[in-house]
Every structure is written in C-alpha cells, then in structure tokens.
C-alpha cells in the first residue's frame, strides 16, 4: 500500500492539471505559433513558467485504485498487475481467464 500522503499528492496534481489545462493550452499555442512576434512568444514562456509545476499533466503518475501502487499499472483496468491477477483468479473480471497453451 502506498502512503496516504502520496495518494493525496496525486489527487492534488490531477486537480491542478484540470484547473490550469485551458491556460496552459492557450500559452502553448502562442509559443508554438510561428506567426506570433518573438516578444509575445517570450512573454508566453515566462507566464507558463509562473504556473505551478504540479499543473503539468506530465507530473501525474498512474496509480492502482485499490493500493496506490505506482508500478505495474494496467490502464485498461485501473489496477496494478497484482490486483488484476487477484481479481482474475476470483473471476471478478468478465472475459479474463488465465492463459493456458
């Protein structure tokens, strides 16, 4: 199990990313616009740097919903590999069965 503080930190990052999504997209559009003046682009870079670091989606980490485990995460299920295996062995995931050949 992950520490509660780590789970809370992830929740905070998701909230910040949602809050600043439009602002970041607007600034990035100005930065990548070749028709914008150099001064406008530079000002957009400076404004982007003033936003909170945790508002960047790349700082988010996928975590298991049950345990908070950051590694071995399977997006399709939202769980870590360990919890997916346990659920599959109990027959809780429809259509998923152990491979045998």
UniProtKB/Swiss-Prot annotation:
Keywords for this protein: Ribonucleoprotein, Ribosomal protein
Molecular function in Gene Ontology: rRNA binding; structural constituent of ribosome; tRNA binding
SUPFAM superfamilies per record: Glucocorticoid receptor-like (DNA-binding domain) (SSF57716)
GO CC entries: cytoplasm; cytosolic small ribosomal subunit; small ribosomal subunit
GO biological process, one term: translation
Pfam families: Ribosomal_S14
InterPro entries per UniProt: Ribosomal_uS14 (IPR001209), Ribosomal_uS14_bac/plastid (IPR023036), Ribosomal_uS14_CS (IPR018271)
Keyword Ribonucleoprotein: yes
PANTHER family the UniProt entry points to: 30S RIBOSOMAL PROTEIN S14 (PTHR19836), SMALL RIBOSOMAL SUBUNIT PROTEIN US14M (PTHR19836:SF19)
Family: Belongs to the universal ribosomal protein uS14 family.
Quaternary state and interactors: Part of the 30S ribosomal subunit. Contacts proteins S3 and S10.
Known function: Binds 16S rRNA, required for the assembly of 30S particles and may also be responsible for determining the conformation of the 16S rRNA at the A site.
HAMAP family per UniProt: Ribosomal_uS14_1 (MF_00537)
Name the UniProt record assigns to this protein: Small ribosomal subunit protein uS14
